Amino acid sequence: MTQNMLTVSALYHFTRFDDPDALRAPMLSLCEHEGIKGTILLAKEGINGTVAGPKQGIARLWAHIAALPGCSDFEHKESTASVMPFKRMKVRLKKEIVTMGQPNVDPRAGTGHYVDPLEWNALISAPDVAVIDTRNDYEVGIGTFEGAIDPKTKTFREFPQWWAENKHRFHNKKIAMFCTGGI
């Protein structure tokens, strides 16, 4: 990697922040000091964001986030860029970090089983598995897994309604869902 390469990193982590507003200013200050740009969303349910900056600065930001309550095990994905992909740094307060419009859903209370890529290939090959692509219409248009069901949503916020209207179709199936952030 050349010296001028930037680290681009994305994360989301569900946890419980009693006062996300108190986390905002210190995080923004750290990012600005380290030359990091992008967007971080903070909510009572956790943190979500994509940022870019010098590798050492990103490492300092991740250390800061890992020190927050409930975040010691957060995961992130990294890539590189030769040009800064973002114009400014924003740390925003939101009601949800992944917009679903479902205030009574607590993602920490129950999630699906995450599988690694080798398990995924075996899983979606099974005849009793329905594969659902939860990404938006633009992302699905770029490509999807063969046989995946496209809910034809413009945003993830539309997915809960689609599921409520269609879950009866899957009563005898295992469900494998995927999105841009992971499988």
Predicted region positions:
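Cytosolic catalytic domains that perform sulfur/thiol-centered chemistry
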Residues: 1-183
